[in-house]
Amino acid sequence: ITEDEPSRVIESLDSFIPENRNQPYDMEKIILDIVDDGEHYPIQSNYATNIITSFARINGNTTGIVANQPMELAGVLDIKASEKAARFVRFCDAFNISILTLVDVPGFLPGVEQEHGGIIRSGAKLLYAYSEATVPRVCVVIRKAYGGAYIVMDSIGLGADKLFAWPSGEIAVMGAEGAVDIINRRELAEAEDRNSYKEKLVKEYNKKFSNPDIAAQLGLIDNI
């Protein structure tokens, strides 16, 4: 039995996300703030540390938590992390345990080793695990939610029952710098001062797109 109210206000969460989008933070601290009595039971905590899988109670109910860990490899999904999370989601579904997913994922880990090892196959395991799960599922976008890696992290397309985003959430194909390099490559090539012009474009892109407002307008998230 917990004395923590599910509707309690946790003021520390308002300032937890760094202003610098590339600065890491400890996702486990967020988990400890939102679960009952500040306690959780990590599973395979020393394996694929770029993703957290754990059990906790929320409002007294046993909950499985899947969360990217920005402190390790920036929270990217690689083969080991994808398969670790997929197995955990399958376990929760088998024993009727609700799933909370906390998302801060910049993408899949690139590289020949990952490709030859079957990163697409491993990512598909996580995608299928979520899409076939019948337990209640809530997803919260904490910061980065980029490309295919976001899709496999219990996006609305996989049937999440509720999907929320913090004001710091960024739901996009890629980060601002990569997007600017592609969208504005001609302008950048012709610019006298490429660096300053790119910096200006990145700021404009972040202001316009690096927020959850457009996703909310399109019905891709339920609330901010």
Regions found by a protein language model. Name each.
Residues 1-224:
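Ligand-binding clefts of soluble mixed alpha/beta catalytic domains
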